[in-house]
Amino acid sequence: MLNAREEEVLNVIIENVKLKGYPPSVREIGEAVGLSSSSTVHSYLKRLEQKGYLRRDPTKPRAIEVIMSELSKNPSSHPLTSELSRYSDEELISIPLLGEVAAGVPLLAVENYDEKVTLPRSFTGYGEFFMLSVRGDSMIEAGILPGDLVLVRRQESVSNGDIAVALLEDEATVKRFYKEKNRIRLQPENSLLSPIYVQEVKILGKVVGLMRKI
């Protein structure tokens, strides 16, 4: 059983993932529940992990994972279960982590199917997906930070303003896409950096979400 504060912390994580596609930071959790000390927030996260409600891997850039099966063992025991019950095992999908993508200079995306990330289908929607680990800081003003994992839906075209993973001479980069009159602009979300202009580019997919280690 969770006490009121533990339940509040868990609910903040769930709601943030539902609304934004990635978990809140320790600071954001603290602000949401009225805790000014990051160490206190970490202690609550540790308790939730020990009780089987969360799983974290401090060695990898993964988001906090809410363990649905632990809650669903006794559906009447916890008020959050009704919100989480729709994430059944049948709705979980394994998404390959292909390597790194630069949010800065283009960087080769090395395919590595040995690593996978499991996500609820309701988070991803339908389609073919892969994930990439972000390096560089050119997308920080869009909330994409070094070490984040971006969730990418495979598609060959995107709309103006979409954040895309583009292939430039066999190197992948994540930028905001704009098709202009006689060129394509790959726009960083960092006011200190300049856009990349090209005549043509291969689109690998659209960034539809991200995960962050906290």
Curated annotation (Swiss-Prot):
Keyword Transport: no
Organism expressing this protein natively: Desulforamulus reducens (strain ATCC BAA-1160 / DSM 100696 / MI-1) (Desulfotomaculum reducens)
Lineage: Bacteria, Bacillati, Bacillota, Clostridia, Eubacteriales
Catalytic residues of the enzyme: S138 (for autocatalytic cleavage activity), K175 (for autocatalytic cleavage activity)
A matching Pfam family: Peptidase_S24
Annotated family: Belongs to the peptidase S24 family.
Recorded GO MF terms: DNA binding; serine-type endopeptidase activity
Keyword Signal: no
Keywords linked to the UniProt accession: Autocatalytic cleavage, DNA damage, DNA repair, DNA replication, DNA-binding, Hydrolase, Repressor, SOS response, Transcription, Transcription regulation
Subunit structure: Homodimer.
Record's function text: Represses a number of genes involved in the response to DNA damage (SOS response), including recA and lexA. In the presence of single-stranded DNA, RecA interacts with LexA causing an autocatalytic cleavage which disrupts the DNA-binding part of LexA, leading to derepression of the SOS regulon and eventually DNA repair.
Name of the molecule in the record: LexA repressor
CDD domains: S24_LexA-like
Catalytic activity, EC: 3.4.21.88
Family annotation (InterPro entries): LexA (IPR006200), LexA-like (IPR039418), LexA/Signal_pep-like_sf (IPR036286), LexA_DNA-bd_dom (IPR006199), LexA_repressor (IPR050077), Peptidase_S24_LexA (IPR006197), Peptidase_S24_S26A/B/C (IPR015927), WH-like_DNA-bd_sf (IPR036388)
